[in-house]
Amino acid sequence: AAEMADSMGIDIFNTSLGYTRFSNDTGGVDELTSWTWDDLDGNTSYITRGADMAAQKGILVVNSAGNSGSNSWKYIGMPADGDSVLAIGATDSSRWRSGFSSFGRGSDARVKPNVMAQGSYVYVSGLDSNGNSMVGFNFGTSFSSPLTAGAAACLWQANPDLTAWELKSIIEESSTQFNYPDTIHGYGIPDFGKAYELATQ
């Protein structure tokens, strides 16, 4: 998909992919095919390498951090571990980290998740059990990621001369914890007003 996106001239690629642990036939964890803590190095998995390659070609790759924060795995998945991937964690409407939002690895220089966006109590449209249109709430970093990708697209429209890497850096620099990132919130919540100023100065 990333190769096709590149061939079509896509500038921003948003995904909710997150590969971590796989089940065996009995419902347990298949240790042979599952990823380990050591594999979260940003270089091991093919999906992460592919996402980083897309970023190297000038695509802003935005990926949900994952919803494993409250289970036994608890860390981001692949390709969110890529150093060129903008991994997005989830907050609630009060700007508190959502309990399900996955944690970063924290054992090297990569800040993961990179930033946070609302992923709890997100208004979404859909169908009810009778097939009628409805609006309701939903949860997940799969909602945080496209919110960030959409805002990034607006920034890029404001200054089309930015590179994907510059845009990623501006989003991080505008965030609430830029000077003290951690493995829970990354650089924090972006201030897209501030990001706009940085993008257009």
Located regions from the model:
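Solvent-exposed, polar/charged alpha-helical surfaces in well-ordered, non-transmembrane soluble domains
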Residues: 3, 7, 49-56, 86, ...
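Extracellular S/T/G-rich loop segment that most often corresponds to the catalytic His/Ser-adjacent loop
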Residues: 80-157, 161
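N-terminal domain-start motif of subtilase-like serine proteases
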Residues: 46, 52-53, 95-101, 190-193
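Solvent-exposed loop/turn segments at secondary-structure junctions
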Residues: 18-23, 67-71, 91-95, 106-107, ...
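C-terminal subdomain of the subtilisin-like protease fold in secreted/lumenal serine endopeptidases
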Residues: 10-14, 157-201
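Active-site-proximal flexible loops/turns
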Residues: 23-25, 73, 121, 149, ...
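Substrate-binding/access-modulating region of protease and related hydrolase catalytic domains
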Residues: 1-81, 107-110, 129-145, 183-184
